[in-house]
Amino acid sequence: MIEKTLKDVKGIIRVSNGETAPDLIVKDAEILDVFSRNIFKGNIWVYKSWIAYVGEKEPPIGDETIVIDAKGYFVVPGYIDAHGHADLFYNPSTFADFVVTKGATTVFSDAHDMINAIGVDGFIEVLKTSDKFAVKFLWGVPAAYPPYPKIEGGELFSIHEIWKLFSRYKECVSISELSPYTRVLHGEDNILERMLMARSLSKNIEGHTLGASYDKLNALVAAGITSCHESIRESDLKNRVRLGLYTMIRHSSIRSDFEQLCPVINSLPIDSMMLVSDGVFAVDLLEKGYMDHVIKKAIDFGLDPVVAII
């Protein structure tokens, strides 16, 4: 994310007021307003990297203003993947270079596979270069990896190392998906202490609650889990929405839950629901696309197009 300076804010205001020409204008576009869920014809004025104005007014045009004639085209916000795996099948840098061409601007990715391969120090180097990626990455830090350390070996991270990542790098926004949720239900000190620390820093806790009953979901939510991407039936979706989880509906290279769940979404409030990729094979990225493909498939399975995008 590019931080604004005071000079930047003043420049945005001057462009928005029509006092100076924008650097770029997208003209005569059909614009999707995600707040009112309406589509209107208008212009978008851009100053440097920021949108300064959206509406019907015509701006002053400077000698260096880039004008894009968008007549007949729809303009929508950049796509966000709220649960991906940018570290599993490819280098995050080359992944970012490709998916930005498919409309993605932000990706939340679990980092346990990357960290398992390159270690904590390698992951920190990735974080240090994050401003050079073509999309904004947000990362989940593994708090339970390997999932069952008594069987699979020692914990990848100490609680202090997790705390350092959360404290020093704003891109680390969550504990990555907790697949061994039975350890939470059994009240293991090790994992609960990590969850408490994360919540004390206002970080999210990604759930992986496949197969959890409504009663078990209650306990997991009470323990601090904030989301889940493992709804595969109508009851799963409704239970997670009811309990206040950020509820993610998946269309990935491994499995898709759209056919069962997209018709259900239309009957529920969507404020806490989102479409996610949960990992896409490289061949599928090249042949089908990324979140643009996810949105198209959701529409194919009956989701309202505007709802699918927002």
Where do the protein language model's features map onto the residues?
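Glycine-enriched alpha-helix->loop->beta-strand junction motifs that scaffold or abut catalytic
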Residues: 104-105, 169-172, 219-227, 242-248, ...
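Histidine-rich, glycine-flanked metal-binding segment
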Residues: 2-25, 30-76
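Di-metal (Zn2+ and/or Mg2+/Mn2+) metal-binding site signature of metallo-dependent hydrolases
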Residues: 73-96
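Divalent metal-binding pocket/active-site signature
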Residues: 177-234, 251, 255
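Hydrophobic faces of well-ordered beta-strands that scaffold small-molecule active sites
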Residues: 78-86, 107-109, 137-141, 173-176, ...
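Divalent-metal coordination cores built from histidine and acidic residues
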Residues: 2-16, 94-204
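Divalent metal-coordination and catalytic microenvironments
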Residues: 29, 49, 72, 83, ...
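His/Asp/Glu-enriched, well-ordered alpha-helical/loop segment
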Residues: 264-310
